Amino acid sequence: MKSFEDIKLTLGKNRQYLFNKYPIQSMAVFGSYSRNEQVADSDLDILIEFNDKIGIRFIDLANEIEELVGFTVDVVSRNGIKEKYFEKIKPDLIYV
């Protein structure tokens, strides 16, 4: 199981590459990893805000992040999450 620090380091090293390849405005980790409550089978929850349409490339982005971190990732678009759910995860957001 990777630590949150390892994940932040991996995402940080690849941030510019991902932001250049995809129309990403911001990217944040939330959920168990951001609260340091992850267990061996936890996935990584990532909220991404886009500055342009991404379309089917959303799947490519999710797969690419999964390859970088080496385990299951659940990527959520900021536009795709209802405001009431965003308010629930907002305190957990750690931008990378």
Located regions from the model:
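Conserved histidines in hydrophobic membrane contexts and catalytic metal-binding motifs
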Residues: 29
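Short beta-strand->loop micro-motif that forms the acidic, two-metal-ion catalytic signature
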Residues: 45-48
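Catalytic core of pol beta-like nucleotidyltransferases
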Residues: 1-26, 34-40, 50-96
